[in-house]
């Protein structure tokens, strides 16, 4: 089912699809990427402009995410201002490129309040790749979430790819 505000997949649908894509990736020996993203300081948007404006921003992000992924990918709203992208047949560099494109386009979003005030937001993104060391949904989620935390810790509005579980250095842009 879908999130009623953004019309993206909801949290439950996301987890069902993630499990299915992991099984498919293992079965066909294909790559799979997960990108988690969080709108930076989103509470300030709601506090300063009200929840109606916050909802307008979330809807715009939903449309943007749908336009940034292929038809076989999945964009989901996990709750609040947290979103995720499931990217089948996508390697580390491909996932980084998608995440960077999303981050950049979110930064370019402009939403106007009824008073004509322009509201902008930024996003932090963390990505992880299914691998020998990251082989199930829990591990993939932890790896992507760790990368998201790293992006936030490095100042927000950036992409971080977590490859520590596969022995590669973190890549942050």
Predicted regions and their residues:
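Catalytic-core segments of nucleotide cyclases and related cyclic-nucleotide turnover enzymes
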Residues: 96-99, 130-173
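Conserved nucleotide-binding and Mg2+-coordinating catalytic segments in signaling enzymes
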Residues: 1-16, 37-51, 59
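Alpha-helical scaffold within the catalytic cores of cyclic-nucleotide enzymes
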Residues: 62-63, 94-112, 143-145
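A short pre-motif secondary-structure segment
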Residues: 74-77
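Residue-level recognition of strand-loop junctions within catalytic nucleotide-signaling folds
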Residues: 47, 87-90, 107, 130-131
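Short helix/loop segment flanking the catalytic signature motif in cyclic-nucleotide metabolism enzymes
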Residues: 57, 70, 84-104, 140
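Short catalytic/binding micro-motifs of nucleotide second-messenger systems
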Residues: 24, 67-72, 104-116, 129, ...
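Short regulatory alpha-helical coupling segments
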Residues: 9-31, 62-70, 88
